[in-house]
Curated annotation (Swiss-Prot):
Keyword hit for Translocase: no
Pfam families from the UniProt entry: IspD (PF01128)
Similarity comment text for this entry: Belongs to the IspD/TarI cytidylyltransferase family. IspD subfamily.
InterPro entries: IspD, IspD/TarI, IspD/TarI_cytidylyltransf_bact, ISPD_synthase_CS, Nucleotide-diphossugar_trans
Function description: Catalyzes the formation of 4-diphosphocytidyl-2-C-methyl-D-erythritol from CTP and 2-C-methyl-D-erythritol 4-phosphate (MEP).
A Gene Ontology molecular function term of the record: 2-C-methyl-D-erythritol 4-phosphate cytidylyltransferase activity
Gene: ispD
Full protein name: 2-C-methyl-D-erythritol 4-phosphate cytidylyltransferase
Catalytic activity, as annotated: 2-C-methyl-D-erythritol 4-phosphate + CTP + H(+) = 4-CDP-2-C-methyl-D-erythritol + diphosphate
Residue(s) at site: Transition state stabilizer: 15, 21
């Protein structure tokens, strides 16, 4: 794949309470190893690690020191990217199929910006204090995943704009959208869930036993 894969993996995993997620073991492999396996066909893979972390050897990636936030880490990776198309992926989403990568890549090549999404399966409710509040139509919402694909020049412009305006976002699509550039949606996958809480590890361990991308 003629694409630069950017993996911000410099987070400290505070919510999970197990140290940096990149080195968390699931099914006998680290999340970083699972993630890199999903992008083994990419021409370039760049990973941002926590400051002071020892870069793993033999994984076929270039390792850089990450920033204080996810956004800062992606910005550093972007500076090092050498190809005209990038995929940005969270290391906490280790189970990424080749089909999902292909869909995002194809849409990004066509439109310049693309993200995978899933419909919301549960009822969405805005609570009123501690009481049941207004139900929000779930059909109007989507869960946003990674990998997210962009023209490299476009994402660099979006990050530069965010720095000028003092914008901070939880993903890169928000920064591109802030430029007024449309972001295409493609079908996501439930297996590409984000490991955030301890209960997510139970699902991840079960999936690791049967996973084949």
């Amino acid at each position: 794949m003629e694409v630069s894969v950017l993996i911000p993996a410099a987070g400290n995993g505070l919510r999970l309470g197990r140290g940096p997620k990149a080195f968390l073991q699931v099914g006998g492999r680290t999340l970083l190893e699972w993630t890199l396996a999903a992008f083994r066909d990419a021409a370039e893979v760049l990973v941002a690690l926590p400051p002071g972390a020892e870069p793993p050897k033999g994984l076929g990636a270039v390792f850089l020191e990450g920033g204080a936030t996810r956004q800062a880490s992606v910005a550093r990776l972007l500076e090092a990217a050498s190809l005209p198309l990038v995929l940005v992926h969270d290391v906490a989403r280790p189970f990424v199929s080749r089909g999902l990568v292909a869909r995002v890549l194809e849409a990004a090549q066509r439109s310049g910006a693309a993200v995978p999404v899933l419909p919301v399966p549960d009822t969405l409710m805005a609570p009123e204090g501690e009481a049941y509040g207004r139900v929000v139509p779930r059909e109007a919402f989507r869960l946003v995943q990674t990998p997210q694909g962009f023209f490299t020049a476009l994402l660099r412009e979006a990050h530069a704009y965010a720095r000028r305006k003092g914008l901070e976002a939880s993903d890169d699509a928000q920064l591109v959208q802030a430029l007024g550039y449309p972001v295409a949606l493609v079908e996501g996958e439930a297996t590409a869930f984000k490991i955030t809480h301890p209960q997510d590890l139970v699902l991840a361990e079960a999936l690791a036993r049967v996973w084949s991308a």
